A protein has these predicted regions:
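Cofactor-binding loop segments of dinucleotide-utilizing enzymes, especially the Rossmann-like FAD-
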Residues: 25, 52-54, 228
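A short, small-residue-rich loop immediately preceding and capping a beta-strand
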Residues: 17-32, 47-50
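Gly/Ser/Thr-rich beta-alpha loop segments that engage phosphate groups in nucleotides
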Residues: 4, 12, 27-29, 33-35, ...
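Glycine-rich ThDP/TPP pyrophosphate-binding loop and its adjacent helix/strand module
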Residues: 32-47, 52, 56-201
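Thiamine diphosphate
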Residues: 1-21
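Generic beta-sheet signal
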Residues: 18-20, 123-129, 223
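ATP/nucleoside-binding phosphotransfer catalytic cores, i.e., glycine-rich phosphate-binding loops
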Residues: 187-228
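Active-site nucleophile and cofactor-binding loops and adjacent substrate-binding regions
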Residues: 1-6, 24-25, 58, 103-104
Length: 228
């Protein structure tokens, strides 16, 4: 528990020819294994990490995790958590990660896309998989993942494409001073020319940090390859 990154790092260092994939959860990767996790990213070890984030400890039966929402009720927080959650994307990019992507467990097409991109990446790749836990945290990502609302509450980023989203493809992301802003195309003189183009390969991590930090309801949640 928590040692997956240490083991996968050792395997890769011992046999660099191996294509190493690691599965871990929000609990073991960001709590008991957090030290191994951030230093593998910092060292840019050529491994592929899939972080399944269901915002709860599932294996150990329902304790709150580092990604549990503020106020979440669990076996170890019967009156609600008093801690604000980690954003895995911010953690990865803050540790100088060279690849970060995010997907939904229910979106097989997008998940396949980001895994293929991760496999091609030279260095440590981290994919955050937003998953449900039917037993201990059912509906963990319901507010953004349900098919009826997904198009308006998430944005799929692809390198070289404009940051446009919405069921009617009429919403976009613009720079607003030093931050980001959601706009409606066709209103207040806004056109597609005003919308940001995603550059996953930019050396400047600032925009990637802002994209990884976007949270509903103020912003759509960013999916796809954010940094590569």
């Amino acid at each position: 528990h928590g040692r997956a990154t240490a083991i996968s790092t050792g395997i890769k260092v011992a046999n660099p020819d191996l294509n190493v994939w690691q599965a871990c959860g929000d609990g073991d990767a960001l709590a008991i294994g957090g030290n191994h996790f951030i230093h593998a990213i910092r060292r840019n070890v050529d491994i592929n990490i899939i972080l399944f984030n269901n915002q709860i400890y599932g294996l150990t039966k329902g304790q709150y995790s580092p990604t549990s929402k503020f106020g979440a009720i669990s076996k170890t927080s019967p009156y609600g958590t008093v801690e604000h959650p980690f954003n895995p994307g911010s953690l990865v990019l803050g540790a100088k990660g060279t690849f970060f992507a995010r997907s939904l467990d229910s979106d097989l097409k997008l998940s396949s896309e980001v895994m293929l991109s991760a496999a091609k990446h030279d260095g440590c790749s981290v994919m955050e998989m937003l998953t449900n836990c039917v037993i201990f945290n059912d509906g963990a990502h319901k507010l953004i993942a349900d098919r009826e609302v997904r198009a308006d509450r998430t944005i799929v980023l692809r390198h070289g494409e404009k940051m446009i989203f919405g069921k009617d493809r009429n919403k976009g992301i613009m720079l607003d001073g030093m931050g980001l802003r959601v706009v409606t195309i066709g209103e207040n003189g806004i056109t597609e020319d005003d919308i940001l183009v995603h550059d996953a390969h930019s050396e400047n991590v600032g925009i990637h940090m802002m994209l990884a930090d976007m949270k509903y309801p103020d912003f759509p949640v960013a999916l796809g390859v954010i940094r590569d």
